[in-house]
């Protein structure tokens, strides 16, 4: 996945000056970040490395642990994200355990838990962690309020996208184009906060990909 995705992200030249490494095995997530970072003219590469996730109730702590682990392995400026779906009627479940819950009970399992629930308020959150030895560890967060749909809708996106409708839209994330989703999503909001900060840096040297 990494090679194909890096070809998609960086089309010009075999030796590109890179500024950071995005660590993720999720192609959809990488494509969402890619579209936003291209708006800022950032060059980066994707590393499909499995960064371990600690069991914690705070997305920021999970992202913090993962980014430091990734840096120890790669020794390059690294960016790692953790995200979660927080459903009010389920007391914030699945929250920071969203990936595990999706893999075990999936979208249908969440809808089953929500059977008969009228108030379907939910929130997607993102914690985006960056680390370089020339900067302190930084975490950027983003959130979007919305609601859980009555049934899965759409074929785009990934994870719980087919059942989440952000406020201000009648579509689920899975029914949106990439451009539409990036106008609403928690991930896009965190990414833009990071990008606004990162573009001001003067001290990071480029790294290179052959």
Where in the sequence are the language-model features?
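N-terminal amphipathic/basic-hydrophobic helices that include classical n-h-c signal peptides
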Residues: 1-15, 209
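Short helix-onset patch at the extreme N-terminus, typifying the N->h transition
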Residues: 7, 24-26
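Anionic-ligand binding patches
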Residues: 17-21, 28-210
């Amino acid at each position: 996945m990494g090679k194909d995705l890096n070809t998609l992200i960086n089309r010009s030249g075999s030796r590109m000056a890179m500024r950071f490494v995005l660590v993720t095995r999720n192609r959809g997530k990488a494509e969402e970040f890619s579209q936003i970072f291209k708006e800022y003219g950032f060059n980066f590469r994707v590393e499909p490395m499995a960064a371990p996730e600690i069991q914690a109730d705070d997305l920021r702590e999970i992202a913090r642990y993962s980014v430091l682990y990734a840096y120890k392995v790669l020794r390059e400026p690294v960016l790692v994200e953790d995200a979660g779906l927080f459903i009010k009627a389920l007391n914030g479940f699945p929250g920071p355990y969203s990936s595990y819950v999706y893999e075990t009970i999936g979208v249908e399992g969440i809808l089953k838990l929500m059977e008969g629930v009228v108030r379907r308020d939910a929130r997607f959150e993102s914690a985006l962690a960056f680390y370089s030895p020339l900067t302190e560890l930084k975490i950027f967060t983003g959130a979007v309020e919305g609601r859980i749909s009555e049934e899965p809708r759409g074929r785009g996106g990934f994870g719980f996208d087919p059942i989440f409708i952000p406020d201000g839209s009648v579509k689920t994330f899975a029914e949106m184009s990439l451009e539409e989703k990036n106008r609403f999503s928690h991930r896009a909001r965190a990414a833009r906060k990071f990008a606004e900060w990162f573009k001001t840096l003067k001290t990071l040297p480029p790294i290179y990909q052959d």
